Amino acid sequence: MEDTVKITAEELKGYIERIEKLEQEKRDVQDHIRDVYAKAADEGWDIKVMKQIIRLRKMDDDDREEQEILLDTYKRALGMSYEEELSE
């Protein structure tokens, strides 16, 4: 029984250490991403728009199209459509 507990404890420790290592790698990647955004901002790029584009690129084409149609519909309902501004 003691051997089983020892093996189980070692296995658990292995999982914990792997997760801790991955968490550190995740923090490192997040730091790199922040650095890229900072460099882009320094060069005049709009970070909010870049993040929005990245979010859209992650979406399925059909989902993205549906969201864009809904957004356009809502904007037109509120008088915020670019097309309406051009016609004025």
From Swiss-Prot:
Domain of life: Bacteria
Pfam families linked: GapR_DNA-bd
GO terms assigned for molecular function: DNA binding
Family: Belongs to the UPF0335 family.
Name the record gives this protein: UPF0335 protein WD_0557
UniProt organism field: Wolbachia pipientis wMel
Higher taxonomy: Bacteria, Pseudomonadati, Pseudomonadota, Alphaproteobacteria, Rickettsiales
